[in-house]
Amino acid sequence: MKLFTISILSLALGYNGIAQNSGKSNSINTLKNEVEKNIQTNYDGYKKIALNIWDYAEVGFKETKSSLLLQNTLKENGFKVDAGVAGMPTAFVATYGSGSPVVAILAEFDALPGLSQETSFVKTPIANRNSGHGCGHNLFGTGSVAAGIAIKKLIEEGKVKGTVKVFGTPAEEGGDGKVYMVREGLFNDVDVALHWHPDQHNTVTYTSSLAIKTAKFRFYGISAHASAAPDKGRSALDAVEAMDY
């Protein structure tokens, strides 16, 4: 779980670097130590949240328990939470602070179908369960919430200024929950958005990636007798296979 902690620190310190006034603020090292202390103090609680979301293993747009757990954690730590935003029951925006900069931290928490798994290094599907966390989104959502809470404490103590928002973004795995949130204008006042993802190493990625466009294609064939009149028919399957190339 060490990299998990480092990733939370990276998110929180990213905010601090944005929010600081270089001439009048605390040193970044002092803030880093305070953030790390806050995270370590609450580490066992965050670990429990991450394991609970792992066990819930809820697929996109159905992450009811996972979303509620993160929302309640933020509420308990002084955030104002708007739930069910952009027409999605499991989406939320949690806000603390006022004024600029407005920094968003994105939290994902959806699982994937067909990836049921015990917390083991070998493939061990859970009996009678289909979905599971193949991309570590149980850590993703928890880490983002932990970073938001650490930042909130610094704002509360007057050590940094601005507003921190934790965006609960459902259905990253193919459902495009963030798209609907953007369409509803929920990011209009945001100066910068911070995002992370569990991985086997800790790094900053500067690369971009391709977008996803969901579409449906229908292929129509012409029926014919396969033996008596094969030349009269057209196979829809041939067109499907041709599209693979």
What does each of the following model-derived ranges do?
Residues K123-G132, N138-L139, I155-Y245:
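Histidine/acidic-residue-rich, glycine-tolerant segments that coordinate divalent metal ions
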